[in-house]
From Swiss-Prot:
It comes from the Bacteria. Homodimer. CDD domains: NifH (cd02040). The lineage of its organism: Bacteria, Bacillati, Cyanobacteriota, Cyanophyceae, Nostocales. It comes from Nostoc commune. This is Nitrogenase iron protein.
């Protein structure tokens, strides 16, 4: 497949939501289906490829460039490794804490990969991106017109939904100039009350779909302890099949939309409606009250 025809997707989500775990398990399932895949990790934790490679952390492009003095002194084989089902794996890396911008590492890595032929003979390139905030750096795959399909990993928890709405706002900012579209919300379950209904409602408000609900299963943690995807660790498990279903949905997805992010007040109203957040009236009764003093509401 020519570079022009490669589908470039990105997984965004707040820290701790299970974004990297969800993306790697889904991409492993896609690779099982014969898709040729390159993962570009864009998270400073450099954990976007560890399950594919059975490793703690891959050497990053930015770290090696700093050691050598320039990215031109790196060989592609040093930073692009092959993992489960021949998935190609790269970590862009990030700056030292408090110094520089994450976007520098991301765009340096992407340019280096393109210039050295890493995007040849691929069906998908996947960017795994931190999404607590969509600052200029972490929005780089969108800003530069690389990622065209965005999938947001979220859950029925308030901060995960808040981050999802912020990410949708970032997608909207570049939708008309770069052609990026929102492919859907992936609900990585936290077993909160009415979680499926809540995320489906949020998806409609954002003009997108809940593309899949991934149930919570301890087998995911068992696989992670072994630095493996569920599809490799327990290929016959129900959870592995869930990732295969999600993988097929992404492969077949034509529902790519310009998102309609909502205001904070509307998000809070939605959370109140589903019992995630207390109403102002109830909150006023609770603020400053100890466990023994607080009224039951």
């Amino acid at each position: 497949m020519t570079e022009e025809n490669i589908r470039q997707i990105a997984f965004y989500g707040k820290g701790g939501i299970g974004k990297s775990t969800t993306s790697q398990n889904t991409l492993a399932a896609m690779a099982e289906m014969g898709q040729r895949i390159l993962i570009v990790g864009c998270d400073p934790k450099a954990d976007s490829t560890r399950l594919m490679l059975h490793s703690k952390a891959q050497t990053t492009v930015l770290h090696l460039a700093a050691e050598r003095g320039a990215v031109e002194d790196i060989e592609i084989e040093e930073v692009m490794l092959t993992g489960f089902r021949n998935v190609r794996c790269v970590e862009s890396g990030g700056p030292e804490p408090g110094v520089g911008c994450a976007g520098r590492g991301i765009i340096t890595a992407i340019n280096f990969l393109e210039e050295n032929g890493a995007y040849q003979d691929l069906d998908f390139v996947s960017y795994d991106v931190l999404g607590d905030v969509v600052c200029g750096g972490f929005a780089m795959p969108i800003r530069e017109g690389k990622a065209q399909e965005i999938y947001i990993v979220t859950s029925g928890e308030m901060m995960a939904m808040y981050a999802a709405n912020n990410i949708a706002r970032g997608v909207l900012k570049y939708a008309h100039t770069g052609g990026v579209r929102l492919g859907g919300l992936i609900c990585n379950s936290r077993n909160t009350d009415r979680e499926i209904e809540l995320i489906e409602t949020l998806a409609k408000r954002l003009n997108t779909q809940m593309i899949h609900y991934v149930p919570r299963d301890n087998i995911v943690q068992h696989a992670e302890l072994r630095r493996m995807t569920v599809n490799e660790y327990a290929p016959e498990s129900n959870q592995a099949n869930e990732y295969r279903i999600l993988a097929q949905k992404i492969i077949d997805n034509k529902n790519l939309a310009i998102p309609t992010p909502i205001e904070m007040e509307e998000l809070e109203e939605l959370l109140i409606e589903f019992g995630i957040l207390e109403s102002d009236e109830n909150t006023a009764m609770l603020v400053g009250k100890t466990a023994t003093e607080a009224p039951v509401v």
